[in-house]
Regions:
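Amphipathic alpha-helical segments of tetratricopeptide repeats
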Residues: 73, 110-117, 150-157, 190-200, ...
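Alpha-solenoid helical repeat architecture
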Residues: 81-85, 120-127, 160-171, 200-213, ...
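DNA major-groove recognition helix of helix-turn-helix/homeodomain DNA-binding modules
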Residues: 50-67
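Short alpha-helical DNA-recognition segment
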Residues: 20-41
């Protein structure tokens, strides 16, 4: 097999020199991001670093990004203390996030990011901006996260490096998906996918993750024509990765196959995902999301008995995570379960907390909750209310540009009329 040679051999040389200065082993430098063997290949110029790895190395090697990447114009510029306060703020924010205080972490990072913008420090803007968008996501501030990522993706320096474009447009796609802008999310995901080759990331973690995001967006849009092919591509690339990556690929596959009506395949991938993700390394919030997904997949397959333990586990774990949006989604799963076991009155009782509570559902989540509520109303003989809700839901689908889903909603309205 031909070795993959880096187009930036000087980067590996800088990494090796600094590592040896600090007396670090390649294993210590690798951390949990890559393997020691990968660091060896990187230092010898046979691998190119991803953006996440560059940021990791900058932190571990205690080198400014400009110096590490060779973009500084002088040694004085590389050691200028002007960004020290921002590095300290970044560290403080990391500490707050580790304690679960994502609101405080976002506050610290937002102030540091604003300062970096005022100073015109492009590398720090990128570093702090990407860190900030993660904390905004964890804090449930999706509109703020979207606005930030749109600013980052619109910067002139965001057009020059394909690896950077992969990162930015991947995150932008998730933010657009999470705020219901599904057509925009699909466009951003395809934009990022077009940069995978130039960025030399084919088959890398970033590629696997991006395919999963694209698949999820297409499923939300009910645009399923290419989903099976994309699933096969994603699973093929994921095979050579560590359990967390494989687990998430199977997780996405379980949801997608369920959407395709292939219940057996969905449950198979659900089992594979569970086997890969049942480790102490899986963040609690991710495990909570997985439990919700498992419950929904099993309800899709008409098995409320199998879904119930996952629902109950999610209800127990939910209070451990400071995430009001997740709490509402768990409640939506409860409503769906109650409908499946014939407790329509319970669904109607729960619904106001889904649509107008402290963290109401939006976008595709609200569409799904509305469909459950409409079915419950119909079962209770409140047909006119069900039809009115479905009409509002069809209009929401149009706003989300989920036109195929809107057609399905109108067909259900027609059956209620007959």
């Amino acid at each position: 097999m031909r070795a993959e040679h880096s187009q930036q051999p000087e980067f590996g040389q800088r990494v090796r020199r600094r590592r040896e200065e600090l007396g670090f082993s390649q294993r210590r430098l690798a951390g949990d991001i890559v393997t020691a063997s990968y660091i060896s290949l990187l230092e010898s110029g046979q691998r190119s670093p991803t953006l996440d790895l560059v940021l990791h190395l900058s932190e571990v090697l205690q080198m400014p990004l400009e110096e590490l990447t060779g973009r500084d114009r002088s040694s004085a510029a590389a050691t200028e203390p002007g960004g020290l306060d921002l590095v300290i703020a970044r560290s403080a924010a990391r500490g707050a996030a580790e304690l679960g205080d994502h609101a405080r972490a976002a506050e610290l990072l937002a102030a540091a990011y604003t300062t970096a913008v005022e100073r015109g420090a492009a590398a720090l803007q990128l570093d702090l901006g990407l860190a900030l968008q993660e904390e905004l996501r964890a804090a449930g501030r999706q509109p703020d996260r979207l606005a930030l990522l749109e600013r980052l993706a619109d910067q002139e320096w965001a057009t020059t490096d394909p690896r950077l474009r992969v990162v930015l447009f991947t995150e932008l796609a998730t933010a657009q998906r999470d705020t219901g802008r599904l057509t925009d999310a699909r466009k951003s995901a395809y934009t990022a996918l077009g940069e995978i080759g130039p960025a030399e990331l084919t088959g890398a973690f970033e590629h696997v993750r991006l395919l999963g995001i694209l698949i999820s967006v297409l499923c939300e849009l009910n645009d399923l024509g290419q989903v099976e092919l994309l699933l096969k591509e994603m699973l093929s690339h994921a095979e050579g990765h560590r359990p967390p990556v494989r687990g998430r690929a199977h997780w996405v596959s379980s949801i997608a196959y369920s959407q395709l009506g292939m219940g057996t395949a969905a449950r198979h991938h659900l089992d594979l995902a569970r086997a890969q993700l049942t480790t102490p390394d899986t963040p609690v919030r991710d495990w909570l999301r997985f439990m919700r997904s498992a419950g929904n997949v099993l309800l899709d397959d008409g098995d409320p008995g199998a879904a119930l333990p996952w629902l109950q586990a999610a209800e127990q774990v939910g209070p451990m995570v400071d995430a009001p949006d997740e709490t509402t989604r768990i409640l939506a799963l409860r409503a769906r379960y109650e409908l499946a076991v014939g407790a329509a009155a319970q669904v109607v009782e729960v619904y106001p907390r889904l649509s107008a509570g402290s963290a109401p559902l939006t976008g595709p989540d609200l569409v799904r909750a509305n469909l459950v509520q409409a079915e419950a109303l119909a079962e209770l003989g409140r047909t006119e209310e069900a039809q009115a809700l479905l009409r509002r839901t069809a209009a929401l689908c149009d706003e989300l540009t989920a036109y195929e889903l809107a057609v399905r909603v109108w067909k259900r309205i027609d059956t209620l009329r007959s």
